[in-house]
Amino acid sequence: MSWFPIAIALVLGLAFGSFMTVAIYRVPAGESLVRPRSRCPSCGAPIRTADNIPVISWLMLRGRCRACGARIPPVYPLTELASGGLFVAVALAYEDPWRAVLLAPFAGLMVAISVIDVRHRRIPNRLIYPAFLIAAAVIIVGDLAGGGLDALDAGIGLVAYGLGLMIIALISPKGMGMGDVKLAGLIGMVLGSIGLDLVAVAAGMGILLGGAGAIVALLAGQGRKSAIPFGPFLAGGAVIAIFVGHPIADAYLNLLT
C-alpha cells in the first residue's frame, strides 16, 4: 500500500478521535455533541480553530488552555492518537474497502466506550444505538454491493454474542450490565459480518482480559464487591479479534485436529 491512503487513514482517524473526545465528556453529561463549540473544561472558554488540531495543538500548547492556562487532560491527545493508529492499522490489515470502512470507526468507538465505562461505569445508549444503525447500514449495503461483508453472519453474531452475555447478566446482574450486553451485540454484529470466528475470538479474549482484570483488582485490594467495568475488556477483545482473530482461530482449530 502506498503512503497516500495511509496518510488519509491517519487524518481521518485523528479527526474521528477528536470527535470521540467530545463524546467522552459530553455524552455522559447529557450535552449536545454539536453545540456549543469545543471549550476548555476548566474555564469554559471556546477553543480556537487553530488550537483544535488533533494532537498537534495539545503539544503546541504544552497541554494547557491558551485562555486560563489550566491543564488539558492527556485523554484528549491519547484518544486521538489511539484512533489514528487504529485507522491506519485497519487500512493496512484490510484491503477490502467495505471492511475497512466498517472496522476503522468501530475500533475508534471502542476506545471512547472504554474510557466512558471506566469513568462512569456505564455504556451510553447515545453511542451504542447510532453505532448499531450505522454499522447495520454499512453491512447491508456492503453485502448487496458484493463487498467482503455478510449480513446473515452479522445477525448470527449479534444474537450469539448478545444473547450469551444477556444470560450471564441475568444470572449475575451485579457483575454484568445491560450496557455490556448491548456492546456485545454490537461487537458480534460487526465482527460477524467479517467472520463468525472473529466473534468467537472476541468473546474468548474478552473473558480472558476480564478475568485478568478481576485478578489484578483483587491483588490491588479492591475486594470482590468493587464494581469493575467490563466494557473495556469486551472492547479489547474485539480489537484483538480485528487484527489477529483469524490466526488465533486457526491455531485453536489446529490444536483440536
Describe each region flagged by the PLM.
Residues 1-97, 254-255:
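N-terminal transmembrane signal-anchor/hairpin module of polytopic inner-membrane proteins
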Residues 6-11, 77-81, 89, 100-104, ...:
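Hydrophobic alpha-helical transmembrane segments
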Residues 16-21, 83, 87, 138, ...:
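Alpha-helical transmembrane segments of multipass membrane proteins
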Residues 27, 90-94, 141, 145, ...:
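Helix-loop junctions at the membrane-solvent interface of multi-pass transporters
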Residues 69-145:
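Intramembrane alpha-helical segments
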Residues 93-99, 192-201, 244-246:
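Transmembrane helix interruption/hinge and helix-loop junction motifs
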Residues 112-211, 215-218, 250-257:
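Functional transmembrane core segments of multi-pass inner-membrane proteins
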Residues 215-241, 252:
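Interfacial loop-to-transmembrane junctions
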